[in-house]
Amino acid sequence: MEPSKGQERSLIKVRIELDPSMDEPEILIRAPRLTQELSQLQESILKQKLVPLAFYKDRSEYFLDLADILFFETDGEKIYGHTKDEAYEVKQKLYELEELLPIAFCRISKSTIVNAKQIYSLEKSFSGTSTVNFYQTHKQVHVSRRYYQVLKERLNEMR
């Protein structure tokens, strides 16, 4: 399928060069100009962490794939990461999670961060609060008016 008029077709060449003299990997992006796509790529790379996020339930510690996390939310003083079937406690604060999580995760209220890749639908209500529904679960969260537009933009970027 050819891009429509006004749409740029973005091609990115990826090359890995091994250099045993280096202490740590380095990523260099060369481009004729800075685009939104390159800025997002840079942000995504910078957010990648080698340290896995630990989740806790009862006396067990779990290392879950972030792709399985629907959302993080506060409940009193605790923060929970929700999968479609379970809720696990995490030790980080929401603002710390915002720094650690990949670009697919987006703040939608004072108490919730959502995984945009897991969103099935977004229902807007007359009261101004919208509801997020997820794939294959009954769990829902609410988007505050303040964060609604940010979420819509993130969802459009992820398409």
Predicted features by range, described:
Residues 55, 146-147:
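Intrinsically disordered, low-complexity N-terminal regions enriched in serine/proline/glycine
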Residues 137, 148-150:
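Short coil/turn motifs at secondary-structure junctions
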Residues 4, 150-159:
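Charged phosphate-binding loop/patch that engages nucleotide di/tri-phosphates or the phosphate backbone
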Residues 1-39:
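N-terminal regulatory/sensing modules of transcriptional regulators
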Residues 142-143, 149:
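C-terminal structural segments of small proteins and small subunits
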Residues 5, 37-136, 140:
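Conserved binding/recognition cores within well-folded domains
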